[in-house]
Amino acid sequence: MRNINEALHEHLAEVLKIYPEDQILGVFAYGSMNYGTYIKGISDVDTKAIIIPTFRELCLNDKPVSREIHFENGEHCEIKDIREIVKMFKKQSINFLEILFTEYCWLNPMYKVLWKIYFCQFKEDIVRFDENKAWQSVIGQAIHTLKQNPTNGKQISNGYRLLYFLEQYKEGKPYLECIKPTEENLATLLQFKKCSCLSANYAKDLIERFEEMKEFRFPKKDNSKLNNWLNNGIEYSIRHLDNIRKEPWRWKYDGESDLSETK
């Protein structure tokens, strides 16, 4: 059976072949293990790695890193510059926002405080940076997923999971409660997920419900302070990398880096 922590270390090892450790903020799992729908021996472990750009790359106006590593077992690691990560946070992409809450990650000790201060400390605010954008983003993702393969059990399961998410998000529930279904709902999702072929009526009904939800709007709010804070997080992370390279002895970490939880 696939061990999630072992997979994280394997993904990190591949990222380290491309970037030095001081440029890697962390490697974070995303997907079924964060929703409670991970099935041992069946589900893949996919990750996102956050890279800090150097001052030289900024001066040369290098394009922010955005690439993927594909593994033979079907898993993949998405590598992104922290500027791109923050951009996806602001776009309210659920696949990126969930890394703020995952229990499965390798967090570079050199960036642990920075990650906590600029991102994790305000994660509930970040996930509601633009609630209307988040709402429409999830609806669009759900409809696209269901239309791709309307009889596939995994897609139907994802559809119901996203419907549950929207219902909880609308009620203002904590984000972790939004992305992790109750035990009762989880049992239903897993049942659907294990089915290879289902009636297309499930997808049809779900799409109709999502289409109806498109009209809903949250009250607008001022997010300028949070926007500035996130931008400061980008700036400070780049300055921090520069400080690490100027005085590496101050940031030396003895021993193997542990898998950490972002809480």
What are these regions (language model features)?
Residues 22, 40-42, 154:
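A generic fold-level signal
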Residues 60, 171-172:
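Short conserved micro-motifs at the rims of enzyme active sites and ligand-binding pockets
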Residues 204-252:
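Low-complexity intrinsically disordered segments
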Residues 1-10, 190, 214-221, 254:
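N-terminal regions immediately upstream of nucleotidyltransferase
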Residues 1-29:
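Helical scaffold of the NTase/Pol beta-like nucleotidyltransferase catalytic core
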Residues 31-72, 159:
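Catalytic metal-binding acidic patch
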